[in-house]
């Protein structure tokens, strides 16, 4: 009678490895969250530090730019630094224009990467395109690495686009230019993938993407792409933008496609504000998947929006404090307290919905609204266990949450 998201589209499973870490994209694997650094890759230490930050935030793959000989030479050192820090997240090399040369001239780089990203629109021009694309695929075969063949609206193969525009002009009923562009993106991606298969790369070594910047454009392209191939698909807008605009655009496009069962890995291409951590894109990606019920990454905090009954800012401050605390604890809790990522915490601002929402959560607190008794009942697994008062409500509630996690999700508890 009632339905949620559509069944997941069937795709080839692509294994991405480093050491003992295996991240599978597609097949029956969960939708993966990945990210990209914005450091100068030639700065091996700075890049390794940012990769570690992204991995600690929960990024399952991290892409790094490999654009110069200096960057390619630094990749093995980045990998070595990460391994020394105990960070085994697979690295994806992002190649444009000269990837065939860098993979040939820097074999240690080719080996240290776990996956290559190839852009068929700029791998070469004219007659050189096919041979240079082939060189990159041959490197992937030689080093047993999967690839993402990533087509971008802004760097589409111009020869292909010109040919398709000419063919469209000869039609009795020409398509709109936008539709020709969509078709060019799809043909470039699928045609390049099929060429890679002809060269000897397995279908289980190929991920496809067709990135654009518009929400409706992305949805239209991926609906058709998913219908016409069985390759694993990487979702993301090319440039989502800054702040709320970028978050909303990414959520609208990616959320809609995931709801239709389309997509095997996602990357949120947010423009970070000056000084803001790069990890924001990882958190947004995780929250899209968790909010949609597709995966669980960290405990969720439910909080009311506030109204005239909640003139105090205490519930807002407490909700932010608890949400930040939970996120900060996850790098440790993820291994120490398996299952904690599914926990729900409610921080409510008044008596109207406070007790009810708190009872539905694993742990909840209903703070007093304007004119209400200055007391905050706490609920654990649906039962009222305590009433907090005074100036230390935040500290006491945080301790209750911490104690609940240790008691409920500790390994000894999980084994009993």
Curated annotation (Swiss-Prot):
It is an enzyme of class 1 (oxidoreductase). One of its GO terms (molecular function) is 4-hydroxy-3-methylbut-2-enyl-diphosphate synthase activity (flavodoxin). Its cofactor is [4Fe-4S] cluster. Its EC number is 1.17.7.3. Keywords: 4Fe-4S, Iron, Iron-sulfur, Isoprene biosynthesis, Metal-binding, Oxidoreductase. It catalyses: (2E)-4-hydroxy-3-methylbut-2-enyl diphosphate + oxidized [flavodoxin] + H2O + 2 H(+) = 2-C-methyl-D-erythritol 2,4-cyclic diphosphate + reduced [flavodoxin]. [4Fe-4S] cluster binds at residues 304, 307, 350, 357. GO terms for biological process: isopentenyl diphosphate biosynthetic process, methylerythritol 4-phosphate pathway; terpenoid biosynthetic process. Gene3D superfamilies: Dihydropteroate synthase-like, Sulfite Reductase Hemoprotein, domain 1. The keyword S-adenosyl-L-methionine does not apply. Binds 1 [4Fe-4S] cluster. Pathway: Isoprenoid biosynthesis; isopentenyl diphosphate biosynthesis via DXP pathway; isopentenyl diphosphate from 1-deoxy-D-xylulose 5-phosphate: step 5/6. The keyword Metal-binding applies. Belongs to the IspG family. Converts 2C-methyl-D-erythritol 2,4-cyclodiphosphate (ME-2,4cPP) into 1-hydroxy-2-methyl-2-(E)-butenyl 4-diphosphate. This is 4-hydroxy-3-methylbut-2-en-1-yl diphosphate synthase (flavodoxin). The gene is ispG.
């Amino acid at each position: 009678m009632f339905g949620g998201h559509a069944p997941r589209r069937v795709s080839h499973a692509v294994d991405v490895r480093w050491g003992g870490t295996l991240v599978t994209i597609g097949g029956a694997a969960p939708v993966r969250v990945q990210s990209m650094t914005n450091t100068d890759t030639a700065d091996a230490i700075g890049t390794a530090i940012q990769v570690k930050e992204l991995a600690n935030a929960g990024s399952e793959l991290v892409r790094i730019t490999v654009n110069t000989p200096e960057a390619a030479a630094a990749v093995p050192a980045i990998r070595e630094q990460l391994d020394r820090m105990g960070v085994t997240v697979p690295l994806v090399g992002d190649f444009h224009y000269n990837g065939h040369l860098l993979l040939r001239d820097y074999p240690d780089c080719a080996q240290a990467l776990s996956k290559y990203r190839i852009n068929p629109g700029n791998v070469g021009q004219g007659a050189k395109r096919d041979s240079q694309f082939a060189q990159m695929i041959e490197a992937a075969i030689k080093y047993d690495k999967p690839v993402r063949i990533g087509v971008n609206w802004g760097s589409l193969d111009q020869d292909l686009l010109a040919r398709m525009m000419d063919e469209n002009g000869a039609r009795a009923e020409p398509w709109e230019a936008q539709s020709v562009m969509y078709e060019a993106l799809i043909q470039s991606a699928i045609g390049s993938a099929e060429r890679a298969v002809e060269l000897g790369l397995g279908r289980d070594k190929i991920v496809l993407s067709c990135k654009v910047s518009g929400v409706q454009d992305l949805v239209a392209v991926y609906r058709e792409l998913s219908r016409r191939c069985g390759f694993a698909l990487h979702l993301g807008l090319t440039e989502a933008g800054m702040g709320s605009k970028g978050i909303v655009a990414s959520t609208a496009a990616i959320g809609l496609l995931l709801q239709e069962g389309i997509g095997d890995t996602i990357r949120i291409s947010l423009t970070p504000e000056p000084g803001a951590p790069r990890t924001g894109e990882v958190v947004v990606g995780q929250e899209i998947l968790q909010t949609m019920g597709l995966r669980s990454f960290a405990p969720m905090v439910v909080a009311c929006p506030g109204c005239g009954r909640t003139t105090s800012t205490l519930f807002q401050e407490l909700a932010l404090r608890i949400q930040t605390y939970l996120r900060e604890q996850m790098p440790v809790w993820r291994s120490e307290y398996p299952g904690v990522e599914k926990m729900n915490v409610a921080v409510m601002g008044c008596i109207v919905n406070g007790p009810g929402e708190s009872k539905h959560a694993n742990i909840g607190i209903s703070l007093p609204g304007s004119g209400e008794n200055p007391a905050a009942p706490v609920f654990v697994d649906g039962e009222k266990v305590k009433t907090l008062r005074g100036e230390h409500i935040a500290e006491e509630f945080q301790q209750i949450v911490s104690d609940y996690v240790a008691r409920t999700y500790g390994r000894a508890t999980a084994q009993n």
